[in-house]
Amino acid sequence: MTDRLDGRTLIVTGASRGIGAAVSQCLLEKGATVIGIARDFQHCTIDNARFRPVPLDLAQVSALPDVLSRLAKTHTEITGLVCCAGRGRFGSLEEFAYKHIRELVDLNLTSQMYVVRAFMPIIKTNGGGDVVLMGSEAALSGGRYGAVYSATKFAVRGFAQALRHECAAANVRITIVNPGMVRTEFFNSLKFEPGSDPDNYIEPEDVASAVCGALFVRRGTVVDEINLSPLKRVVRRKTDDDDNWR
């Protein structure tokens, strides 16, 4: 077992900020080259010669097959994926416009499946590697106002479980990480957030440490699933309107 990733190239989605940026930084510190995918890098603070940003809006799923196919042809050295891109939207089901349901499914589920589909043949050709998918504690238990969001995360978890069986013979390890509330911009557009006490939230670096830890175990061992929770679970509403947490 080693804690170095020298010579490996991994793709990280959602790489410009939050969990994706923290994962990218951790991988870079361990010697990997990171192909970072994000909608834009305007606020990205990563400064490393082995970090290669690729501006790409994964929410535009109709364009992804062609774009990802071209990207795969130019990055045949890939041996791993860490899919961090995603967003949250909450509210009772009837409050969701149909287009908002589709948008959440497209980014949280379909785009992850497309990215894995595009690069899995390369990873297998290169002798195997790792795919890490970002789930959520909402993939473990559904909650009020989270029907659509939880559905996307439960689906990602099922995708990971099935892939694990499908890809083992090709030496590809599949891991899903299910974090609780992480202190990121995820909550900027929502009407609730974790309480201010640091024990009420997870830091992006905590998730990154878990991801890197899964990569460092012996090649014949798979870290199937990692569940991360804050020590406490206080949630603060930004509004007194109990009927709208979107």
Short names for language-model regions:
Residues S16-R17:
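Conserved glycine-rich cofactor-binding loop
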Residues C84-R89:
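Conserved NAD(P)H cofactor-binding loop of Rossmann-fold oxidoreductase domains
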Residues S92-L93, H100-V105:
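Substrate-binding pocket helix/loop in short-chain dehydrogenase/reductase
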Residues V116, T152:
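Active-site helix of classical SDR
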Residues P121, Q161, H165-A168:
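Alpha-helical segment proximal to the catalytic Tyr-Lys
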Residues S136:
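Residue(s) in the substrate-gating loop at a strand-loop-helix junction
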Residues A170-V172, I176-V177, P194-R236:
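C-terminal helical subdomain
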